[in-house]
Structures are given as C-alpha cells and as structure tokens.
C-alpha cells in the first residue's frame, strides 16, 4: 500500500515474525476477535513479539456501517509506524480499509484509492463483495453531482441502507444472487 502500510491474507506466526523483523509494530485484524485457531495463534504471536494487535470486525459482503467507519477512522488515525492490515484473504475488507487509509491519511483521490479493491488483490467486483466498490462509487457519483469532501460525505450524507438498496438494484448483484455471476459464467464456458 505504502512503504509503511502492508496488506495480506491471514498471517501465520512465521509471517508475523518476519514482519516484526522488518519493523512492523502494529497488526490490524479486520476479521475481529474470534475463537478460531488462526486468531488464537495470531494473538499469541503478537503478544510474544510485542506487536500491537487491533481487532475490527468488518463484513466483506455488506456496506460498512457508520460504527464500522468510526472504528476504521479511529484505527487509521492511531497508526504510528509500520503496520500490517489483513482479513482472511487480504482482498475485500483489507481493500476497503487500505483505500480509506490512502484517502484519509495520504490524501490520495478516491478514484485512485478505490483501486485497492481490485483483481490484482483477489477482489472480484461482480460478486456480493462488489458492495465495497459501490461504497466508493456512491461517493464519486454524489461528488460529481454535488462536490463534497469525502469526510464530509461520510459524516453527513453516507447512508448504509441506501447504499445497500442501490447496490442490490444493480445488474451484477442480481446476477450473483441468482448464481449467474462471473464464476458461473466461467464454469459454463469450460469444455
């Protein structure tokens, strides 16, 4: 993402050791605290290495709530030093967070920052996770009609329910919901 912000899928303890050796001081886990083995291993290894572990539970197939965005903004404001950001696959939730980081901390334009949600990272827009792309698109559409700063839009205009309704009315979501998304089309084209 930047020279101080890295993204990944769920790290194993050996990955955390390698990152700590490279100077990473904070790990932001977008899966939230949970009782599964991967989280327990991550928690134990972060404690052993002296890494700060920040847990934020986000959903990959739902518009971020106002509370989600408040937690994300708080975490972004608190980043001080090399940081790893991850979810399960490093694609969807991580892409949303990294895009927001670039906008809020680095001043990157929204149209550029939204590229953190891309096929390069394993994110596929034409599935239910496309709601995260729609989040950025929704702002860009509003800003084209009525110019507004991104943070002002978040604070005064953003409505997760309206965003979700708008996304569900879209063509790609309807195809994915009926099982006719990209995966089904690719499967049908195989000999």
Per-segment meaning from a language model:
Residues 90:
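Substrate/cofactor-recognition hotspot
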Residues 93:
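Active-site adenylate/phosphate-handling loop in enzymes that bind or generate adenylated species
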Residues 87:
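Short cysteine clusters
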Residues 1-83, 96-191:
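Cys-dependent protein tyrosine phosphatase-like superfamily
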């Amino acid at each position: 993402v930047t020279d101080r912000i890295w993204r990944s899928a769920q790290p194993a303890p050996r990955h955390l050791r390698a990152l700590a050796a490279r100077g990473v001081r904070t790990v932001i886990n977008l899966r939230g605290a949970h009782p599964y083995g991967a989280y327990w291993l991550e928690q134990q290894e972060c404690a052993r290495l002296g890494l700060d572990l920040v847990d934020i539970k986000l959903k990959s197939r739902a518009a971020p709530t106002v509370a989600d965005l408040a937690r994300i903004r708080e975490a972004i404001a608190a980043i001080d030093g090399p940081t790893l950001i991850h979810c399960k696959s490093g694609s969807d939730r991580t892409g949303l967070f990294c895009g927001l980081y670039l906008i809020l901390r680095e001043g990157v334009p929204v149209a550029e920052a939204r590229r953190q949600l891309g096929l390069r990272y394993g994110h596929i827009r034409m599935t239910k996770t496309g709601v995260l792309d729609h989040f950025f698109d929704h702002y860009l559409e509003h800003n084209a009609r009525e110019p507004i700063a991104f943070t002002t839009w978040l604070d005064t205009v953003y409505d997760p329910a309206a965003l979700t309704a708008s996304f569900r009315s879209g063509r790609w979501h309807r195809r994915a919901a009926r099982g006719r998304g990209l995966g089904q089309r690719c499967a049908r084209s195989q000999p």
